[in-house]
Amino acid sequence: MLERNDLWNLIKFSMEQDLSKITFQTFVEPAKPLQLDKAQMTIEVPTQLHRDYWEKNLAAKFTDIAMQATNEQIRPVMITEEERQQLTRDKDSQVTTGNVAGQQPTTATTPTFMRETKLNPKYTFDTFVIGKGNQMAHAAALVVSEEPGTMYNPLFFYGGVGLGKTHLMHAIGNKLLETDPTSNIKYVTSESFTNELINAIQTKKQEAFREEYRNVDLLLVDDIQFFANKEATQEEFFHTFNALYEDDKQIVLTSDRLPNEIPQLQDRLVSRFKWGLSVDITPPDLETRIAILRNKADLEGIEIPDDTLSYIAGQIDSNVRELEGALARVQAYSRLNNSPITTSLVADALKSLHLSSKLSEVSIPVIQEKVAKYFHVTMADLKGKKRNKQIVIPRQIAMYLSRELTESSLPRIGNEFGGKDHTTVIHAHDKITKALKTDAELQKAVGDLTGQLKS
């Protein structure tokens, strides 16, 4: 029998010939062979979603290729990275699966059949940089683009601004159009959906509105959290959702939070949004930020050294949008000064342009330090579990300011406060927001702290 790695390399090579580039890079390339016994090969994959995809779509192909190569029946046994780490947690060394997919940036193929989909042709799977914080979301999006209306319906992305939710949503639509140019795809923001509904009611064209939204193959709705408190919109969308779901049409939604955390969202909508798969997207780590910048620089034809990219990535840890904005500002500064892009030039450009994020020094630890000093409590108190009022209110204010003044995700804020659940952060933010309307003392405290942090 072939050795484990030899057999794996042969199987990978064969699959690469048969599968699309994106499918291979997403599901096969990150996989790692751990052990080969007589009848099975144990393979590690990044997430449960990867394992499900392998078991449904790739296991039989694996066995066929192995049979041809060894004349033996060998089946793949999938194990997730987390499961493997639990099994080997007593060991010091850990296998690194890689945060970035490592694919070279490619020029996106612009579909020539954009019609009225409102899809951005630049938002494709090819232009999406995969990292630890978005790996599962990317894999789920790819599955949905290949098998809409079957496996994950609805697909619900949630996370902070500028992390790639909209990019993945558009990538699904663009991929489906490449596969079937006749597909009827509708992309809309929640605000546009509401405005179109209001207009339809005013002009008495509700039936035309329903016809437009209930006869699509793929419905993409961005920022669903803005449906909160809009009863008529929720009522209409409830029936639209049902019509599409019952007809096996794919629905993809995005939000800055989980369905059950959206205030004043009808329980029946919350329930339906949970029928499929909810996937969070978290801020990119350093390696992913560098890869994002390199990808953007290559696409834009910007000449920039690797150490300079690393410097930019080290300055900004909030989101992709701000990263790309920083690169654009650096490019403009370089042109204005007719100078090549260097680390020194980048430092000057970002300083003079007052870029936010780390450069403004407003971070969660800084907020905690200011709040602790203001209320005469300790940092340990803010991060601890004490429930007395003298501690709880400063802690909630610190969480509120972390949500308002940084781009950090809810889970990250929770982690900075001693591993609190993200729902605790939401509760704190909502409570302070409500109290600020009537509590003059609280208004002064929050105002003082905000002024200190922004000065």
UniProtKB/Swiss-Prot annotation:
SUPFAM superfamilies: P-loop containing nucleoside triphosphate hydrolases (SSF52540), TrpR-like (SSF48295)
InterPro entries: AAA+_ATPase (IPR003593), Chromosome_initiator_DnaA (IPR001957), Chromosome_initiator_DnaA-like (IPR020591), Chromosome_initiator_DnaA_CS (IPR018312), DnaA_C (IPR013159), DnaA_dom (IPR013317), DnaA_N_dom (IPR024633), DnaA_N_sf (IPR038454)
Segments for region (Domain I, interacts with DnaA modulators): 1-75
Region Disordered, annotated ranges: 84-107
GO CC annotation terms, alphabetical: cytoplasm; plasma membrane
GO biological process: DNA replication initiation; regulation of DNA replication
Region (Domain III, AAA+ region): 118-334
Region: Domain II, residue numbers: 75-117
Listed Basic and acidic residues bias regions: 84-93
Subcellular location: Cytoplasm
Domain of life: Bacteria
GO MF, any single term: ATP binding
Annotated region described as Domain IV, binds dsDNA, given as residue ranges: 335-455
Major localization listed first in the record, in broad terms: cytoplasm
Gene3D superfamilies attached to this UniProt entry: 1.10.1750.10, 1.10.8.60, 3.30.300.180, P-loop containing nucleotide triphosphate hydrolases
UniProt entry tagged with the keyword Nucleotide-binding: yes
Residue positions binding ATP: G162, G164, K165, T166
Keywords per UniProt: ATP-binding, Cytoplasm, DNA replication, DNA-binding, Lipid-binding, Nucleotide-binding
SMART domains: AAA, Bac_DnaA_C
Family named by the database record: Belongs to the DnaA family.
Subunit structure of this chain's protein: Oligomerizes as a right-handed, spiral filament on DNA at oriC.
General function of this protein: Plays an essential role in the initiation and regulation of chromosomal replication. ATP-DnaA binds to the origin of replication (oriC) to initiate formation of the DNA replication initiation complex once per cell cycle. Binds the DnaA box (a 9 base pair repeat at the origin) and separates the double-stranded (ds)DNA. Forms a right-handed helical filament on oriC DNA; dsDNA binds to the exterior of the filament while single-stranded (ss)DNA is stabiized in the filament's interior.
Free-text note regarding domains: Domain I is involved in oligomerization and binding regulators, domain II is flexibile and of varying length in different bacteria, domain III forms the AAA+ region, while domain IV binds dsDNA.
Protein name as catalogued: Chromosomal replication initiator protein DnaA
The organism of origin for this protein: Lactiplantibacillus plantarum (strain ATCC BAA-793 / NCIMB 8826 / WCFS1) (Lactobacillus plantarum)
